[in-house]
A protein has these predicted regions:
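Active/ligand-binding-proximal structured segments within catalytic/core domains
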Residues: 59
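C-terminal structural segments of small proteins and small subunits
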Residues: 64-86
């Protein structure tokens, strides 16, 4: 993830989840990088800029990580992750 995208993601996260100002951007950036490795590895090749499901999953992963509840994220979002993986398995032309 590029720095511009990381900065935008941190800003979105702070606004959407009402993260207090005393929680530093660098800490949120660390959660984003951690989430990129965790969530991104579940569906390699997806782009955070164009894939809105990936973006949503990453922000929610960051929120759960912020509250130290990563295992609950995996339990709660497993069906969304599976659907996301299945949707991106087939390309636009309908071929595998």
């Amino acid at each position: 993830m590029e720095n511009t995208e990381l900065t935008a993601l941190v800003s979105e996260m702070r606004a959407e989840f009402q993260i207090p100002p005393y929680y530093e951007d660098s800490q949120l950036a660390n959660l984003a990088r951690e989430g990129e490795c965790t969530v991104g590895s579940l569906n390699p090749g997806c782009n955070i800029t164009t894939d809105l499901t990936y973006r949503m999953l990453l922000k929610n992963y960051m929120y759960y990580a912020y509250h130290h509840r990563v295992s609950e994220f995996m339990d709660n979002y497993s069906s969304v992750i599976l659907t996301w993986q299945m949707e991106t398995e087939v390309d636009v032309n309908g071929t595998a």
